[in-house]
Amino acid sequence: MNATLNSILADLDSIGLDELNKRAAMLTRVDRKYALEAVTASAILSHLPEETRVLHIDGQVSQGYASTYYDTPDMDSYLLTALKRRRRFKVRTRSYLSSGASFLEVKTRGPRGVTVKKRMPISWDEAGTPLAGERRQWVAGKVEETGYGHLVPALEPVLAGSYERNTLLLPGGVGRATVDTNLSWRSLRTDGTEVTRPDLVIIETKSGATPSVVDHLLWEGGVRPVKISKYGTVMAAMHHLPANKWNRTLDRYFHDYVEAPELAHSAPLAMAA
C-alpha cells in the first residue's frame, strides 16, 4: 500500500469486527465503486472526519484477501455480466488471509434485478480448487434460480486474485467503506499471465439512500463512481473480451493491456454462441 495512504488509515481509531457488523448493519444499501490512483486517494481520504473508525483484526489494520473465480470454457458467467443480461451469476472462493477462513460464494441476479449473495464455509485447502461433490451441488442449487443451472458442471477455476483491504465505519454508523490496494491477478486459463496494479485503489461505499461522507469527499475531489469488477474488468484486459460495460475503466487503468495485447501473453478466448 502507498505509505501515505497506509499512515492515514492506520491513524484512525480502531473498531472490532463484531462491533462493526452491529453498528453498520443495513437492510437496504446503495453500493458505489470508485477507481483512482493511490496519490489521489491519499489526498482525499486525509480529510476523513475524526470520528471515522477503521477495522482492526488481530492488531492488523489491513487484511489480505485471496479470491478464485470460476467460469465455463465459453466464459458464460463473464458474458452474462458484460452483456448486461438481467439474469446472471458469479461463483468464487474467498479466503481471508488474516484469519485463515475460506468461503465458497455464489452471487446471483434474478429477473427483478435483485442481487443475492450466498456463501458456505470451506476448508483452506479447498479454496481455488475444482468444484466437486457437495460443493458443486450447492452451487448448482443457488445458480438454478437464474435459469443457468445447466452451466454449473462446466465451471472451472479461471482467475486468481489478491488484494489488501481496509474497512471503514463512517461517523454515526450510517455506512461503511472499503479501500482495496495492492491488487494483483493471475490467469488460470493460459500460461499464468499476471496483471498487477500497485498504484490503483478501489474504494467501495455502502450506505443508505443518502450518499456517505466518503462519497461526498470523492465527488469534491473530482472522482465519480465507475463500473469496475475485480473479475470482469481484468478478464477483459487479459483476453480482449467484449467489455462495453467496463470500457472507460479499461482505457484508464488497464490501457497497457488493451493497447498492447502481447503484454498479456494470452490469446482471446472462445466466445459462447
Language model segments and positions:
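Phosphate-end processing signature that detects enzymes handling 5′-triphosphorylated RNA
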Residues: 1-273
